[in-house]
């Protein structure tokens, strides 16, 4: 009898404890990032960008670090969420956006020193549902075709990550991500509109990257997907792709638009994506980041290689790295140095004058 009574009391205590834990649980959208600069700068980071004279790097757990001395030292800054961050971009020296898991969009107006949340997956789902119903009521056939996608997006909640962000100016910007997840703002991020039914992506491939070239906006993604934003139609139209593997990034060099991705595949176009030429790379590593470096540009790979383009456009040379790692992103620290983010935080790599002049 005593054993039964003890078991009953224990069960009640366990249930009460579980209920308390459930009531107290807070997800990454509700918990600010923990600030520990030493830990954050030496562990995995996923993206880095230039903000005027500063550099800003982002990574897991909502980590954001800022450097004001070309990457020589870093300071972690407070962030209102602890969601994993994937990409960061600046439209000018002060205004920037970071995006990542849980549908998070963060904005800074002071070169990365402070951040506010402008959108998350829960809000995105509500906006998508409302916009979808309105579009269907107005007779949009494209919206009707997206019903299954929108329904899944709403039902599955805040789990869809944004993988890239690009603002054309301080007001108009785009975010893209997994499973055709895409939104646009025209008021600096105060409000957002879904683009699900305004993208020629019937298989809902992941959207990995955004870039502008010659005044036009492009997107790239899974299985060779390339898209061009038709401003008149307000629609991302598919472009004939030179490659059926995934593209992880796009880079505007001024003269050309570079698309890079899986297994070292790099392509360039100089005629508005009508034709593409393949650029040979020295290794089959997936290319995951790119940045302009003076008159040249550099790419980084998951295999820890830094590739510097040759002046004649014929290919790349591998630049020795002082501390190679599995790279995820790269930005120019100066005309002669790069800052790379990856598996072991951030690294500054100096490119010798001779190496640049010889290319």
Go through each PLM region and give its residues.
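Bacterial N-terminal signal peptides that target proteins for export
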Residues: 1-9
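N-terminal signal peptide c-region/cleavage motif recognized by signal peptidases
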Residues: 16-20
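Residue-level hotspots at or immediately adjacent to binding/recognition sites across diverse folds
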Residues: 21-359
């Amino acid at each position: 009898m005593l054993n039964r009574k003890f078991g009953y009391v224990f069960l009640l205590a366990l249930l009460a404890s579980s209920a308390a834990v459930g009531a107290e649980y807070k997800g990454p959208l509700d918990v600010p990032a923990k600030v520990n600069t030493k830990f954050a700068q030496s562990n995995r980071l996923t993206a880095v960008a230039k903000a005027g004279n500063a550099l800003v790097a982002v990574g897991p757990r909502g980590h954001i670090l800022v450097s004001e001395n070309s990457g020589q030292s870093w300071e972690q800054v407070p962030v209102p969420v602890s969601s994993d961050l994937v990409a960061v971009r600046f439209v000018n020296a002060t205004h920037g956006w970071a995006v990542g898991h849980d549908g998070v969009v963060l904005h800074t107006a002071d070169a990365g020193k402070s951040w506010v949340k402008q959108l998350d997956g829960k809000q995105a789902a509500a906006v998508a549902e409302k916009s979808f119903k309105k579009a269907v009521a107005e007779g949009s056939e494209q919206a009707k075709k997206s019903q299954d996608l929108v329904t899944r997006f709403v039902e599955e909640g805040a789990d869809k990550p944004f993988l890239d962000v690009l603002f054309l100016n301080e007001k108009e910007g785009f975010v893209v991500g997994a499973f055709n997840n895409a939104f646009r703002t025209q008021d600096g991020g105060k409000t957002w509109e879904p683009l699900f039914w305004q993208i020629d992506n019937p298989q809902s491939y992941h959207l990995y990257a955004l870039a502008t070239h010659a005044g036009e906006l492009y997107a790239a993604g899974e299985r060779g997907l390339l898209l061009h934003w038709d401003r008149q139609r307000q629609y991302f139209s598919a472009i004939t792709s030179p490659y059926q593997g995934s593209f992880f990034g796009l880079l505007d060099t001024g003269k050309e638009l570079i698309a890079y991705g899986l297994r070292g595949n790099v392509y360039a176009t100089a005629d508005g994506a009508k034709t593409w030429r393949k650029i040979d790379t020295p290794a089959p590593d997936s290319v995951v980041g790119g940045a302009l470096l003076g008159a040249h540009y550099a790419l980084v790979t998951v295999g820890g290689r830094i590739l510097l383009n040759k002046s004649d456009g014929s290919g790349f040379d591998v630049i020795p790295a002082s501390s190679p790692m599995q790279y995820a992103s790269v930005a120019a620290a100066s005309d002669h140095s790069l800052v790379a983010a990856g598996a072991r935080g951030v690294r500054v790599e100096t490119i010798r004058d001779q190496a640049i002049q010889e290319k």
